[in-house]
């Protein structure tokens, strides 16, 4: 009964409002990575209430690096399929906004046209480099430049509930807590709806230190890819609002495809893989084949 009520609520509430409510809530929420329409459908069906449109995962699915090698129009096309296939909100990993304030505000306009609920922008220079690269030299944008980008995005959005998340890369660049707090406060004052505080340490000391000093000035989102052994109750205790499971569907696909391809290549047979892969009927179901059958009965 409760599950049906929640399903009805989420299907009738605007995606932007759904995402805003999740971010603003005192309860810790979780969103899961997807990188195309199929993975988005699986995330929604699993029960997640939101989707992370991962720049790394979308780029990887295209076979290119996470360095803005996929153009924003190519990313928008992927997002359109993801949005059409689901009723839950998508928060896009918008990198640096694909340029300056003008590129970023145009991105917001195009995202709203596709019913994307929000965008997360990071305070690095364009083109970006992935934050988890071992030898990646990270260059941060000047604070005033990124502040202007946030303001331009907020001024551009037509839906008041569209979310602009400011991702602070001070820890990633090795600039420390003081700089992280300085940037987060500037972005909050510029109108950012939430702060995504990123860290690539294997333990969460940087995030813990930030949360203690931040004192719930505005919602905080984290991405515990590297400090994944920390219990989520710890994040609740610190006052984190949202956790992003950022790239695991894409990585699961990579592992599964590598193993399946290797096995078929070595065996010259499907005998050992057929029991382990999804049935074709399951793929048809996820594609919505039943709806087409019903439509055929009605219109043909």
Curated annotation (Swiss-Prot):
The keyword Isomerase applies. Disulfide bonds: none annotated. InterPro entries: ICL/PEPM, PEnolPyrv_PMutase_core, Pyrv/PenolPyrv_kinase-like_dom, Pyrv_kinase-like_dom_sf. CDD domains: ICL_PEPM. Pfam families: PEP_mutase. Pathway: Phosphorus metabolism; phosphonate biosynthesis. It catalyses: phosphoenolpyruvate + H(+) = 3-phosphonopyruvate. Signal peptide: none annotated. Residues 1-10 form a propeptide. Belongs to the isocitrate lyase/PEP mutase superfamily. PEP mutase family. Its EC number is 5.4.2.9. It is an enzyme of class 5 (isomerase). The gene is PEPM. Formation of a carbon-phosphorus bond by converting phosphoenolpyruvate (PEP) to phosphonopyruvate (P-Pyr). It comes from Tetrahymena pyriformis. One of its GO terms (molecular function) is phosphoenolpyruvate mutase activity. Keywords: Isomerase. The keyword Ligase does not apply. This is Phosphoenolpyruvate phosphomutase. The active site is at residue 66. GO terms for biological process: organic phosphonate biosynthetic process.
